[in-house]
Structures are given as C-alpha cells and as structure tokens.
Amino acid sequence: LHKSIPRVETRYFITIYEEEELKNDVLLRFAKLDFNLLQMLHKQELTEVSMWWKDLDFVTTLPYARDRAVECYFWTVGVYAEPQYSEARVMLAKTIAMISIVDDTFDAYGIVKELEVYTDAIQRWDINQIDRLPDYMKISYKVLLDLYKDYETELSKDGRSEVVHYAKERMKEIVRNYFVEAKWFIEGYMPPVSEYLNNRLATSTYYLLTTTSYLGMKCANKEDFEWLTKNPKILEANVTLCRVIDDIATYEVEKGRGQIATGIECYMRDYGVSTEEAMEKFQEMAEIAWKDVNEGILRPTPVSAKILTRILNLARIIDVTYLHNQDGYTHPEKVLKPHIIALVVDSIEI
C-alpha cells in the first residue's frame, strides 16, 4: 500500500469496504459522495488539458510524437488529488505532455545538427531564436516558450511569477542531457555506466517534474525551490528510482531498436555480467532508492510535509506505471487504463 497511488487505493478500498458486514453505511455514503464530487473537478481539469492538447494539433503537425494527454493528467492526480491543487495539476499535466514532445524530438526524429541548434535555442529561451530552427522544431519551441509565459502570467496573480525561473532551468537541464543521449545513439557510443547514470538521471524527467509540481502549490515559496536546486538526498533517490525502473522496463524495446547505450548494456559490459545479473543490480538500486525516499520523508528537513509528499507520490507513480517491469507510459493499455477509468471516467454508484 505504501508504494501505491493514494487516490487509486481510495477508489478500490471503497469497493472493498462496501462488502464488509460491519460497515458504517453513513461513512460509506459520505466516502462515495466525496469521491464523486472530487472526480467532477478532475474531469473538468482533464477536459481543459485535453482541449489544450487538441488545439495544439501535435497529432497532425508532429506525427512522430506520442499522444498521451490523458496519461499525463493521470500522473498529476497521483501527485496530488486534493481540490486545492487544481491549478497545479493542470500545469504539471501540460508540462509532462510537453516534455514528451521534446523527448520524442530528440529520441525519434531529429538529426544531430538540428538538435544542436534546438538545444542552444532552448538554453537561450528567446522567441527570436525561432528562425534558426527547421519548421517542425519551430512548432514545439513556440509552444514551449508560450507555456512557461502562461505560467508566469498565472502565478503573477499571487506574486509568485519568479518561481517559474526554477522550472525553466530544469527544462534547460533536461534538454542538454537529451542532446548528449542523442549523440550517443547516433554515434553508437556506449559510455561507462557511471557516465551513463550521471547523464540519464536528468533525463528521467524527475528533476523537472518535481520542480514543476511545486509551481501551482501556493504554499511553495522561493526557499522551497532553492532547497530543491541543491538536489537533496530524497530527490536524488527519487530520480535514481525513476531511472533504474525505467531502464529495466524499457530494456528489451530499446535493445530491439538498436540502442546500445542502455543502462543494462553499459553495466553488463563494465562488470562482465549477464543480463539477469545486471537486472538484479538495477532492481537492488531501486530498493535502496526507495529506502532513501522513505528516510527523507521521516527525517527533519527545512521544508514542509506538503512539499516532501510530492516527491513520495512521484515515486509511487513510477512503481504503478512500471508494474511488473512493463512500460505503462508508452503502452498505457497494459497498466494504466483500468486506473484511469476508475479515477476519471466511472463514478461510484451511490
């Protein structure tokens, strides 16, 4: 239960509790009403995110990109389901969808020279850089800059627009590391596992997503963002957890498409071990990372429990999305679809 998504477990526990002989009918009815009322808000938010995604029309203009708006929103409900985080969920869902577009540009479509210019343009974060880009990159570049401008406008209402800077810097960081990985793939370079992990931790997206998850939280102040920039142990553990679980789940697919610079392959070469032994090592790293996340939740820190809980919930999402070493993000029908239906499609019958 500790590694499960709280909102998912809430939905399933209501069904289980309903079968109990000694159930409290008033409490059960209240739980159902509470779930359905909050679900109505979640449905409204999903509609907003879906309409934003549809209006961008990436499915037509960037056909190489994954169409995962619903799955992106599901992740945000895992991070925070409470009604006061409505704005935060919408912001985070849009960011997850956007980083998927950027990732696919590096991973499946761009060539080195174009990717180098794209990377530099994002580092400069200036719309005047757009003319340097090929047409297909202009589309995602403009949307990316517009998105963060919208965040600044929205947060300025509460005098918090300056914290968007921290999310921008994390976006620049991940793009730099995407470019390194793209060169590895194109050049057929297999780095030492230490170099691999040093770069790939950033491209796990969890530095970016954790920072972004705080944008819409009015309780998150500049000091919280500063704390996060220092990459505290709990964040490093969560990023490592995301990286190694993803590497285990996607190994066969990446190997099948000729990608030699995978974590498993690098570890096998460096230590002269079999695939099974490398998998076991990565699983061990995941277990250690979970212990470090739990330690970080329990130990005194300069930030509040509300801030720490986002990191814990992001860890939980990884465990659910990659359950039984399946890539539930790329293939949501395998893992996430039943949860999505339960949380944002089907209401509970009163």
UniProtKB/Swiss-Prot annotation:
EC numbers for this chain: 4.2.3.21
Residues reported in the UniProt entry to bind Mg(2+) 1: D103, D107
Subcellular location(s) per record: Cytoplasm
Names of required cofactors: Mg(2+)
Single GO biological process annotation from the record: diterpenoid biosynthetic process
Induction behaviour: By elicitor from R.solani.
One GO molecular-function entry: vetispiradiene synthase activity
Involved pathway(s): Secondary metabolite biosynthesis; terpenoid biosynthesis
Its biological purpose: Sesquiterpene synthase that catalyzes the formation of vetispiradiene from trans,trans-farnesyl diphosphate. The initial internal cyclization produces the monocyclic intermediate germacrene A.
Protein name, per record: Vetispiradiene synthase 3
Protein species of origin: Hyoscyamus muticus (Egyptian henbane)
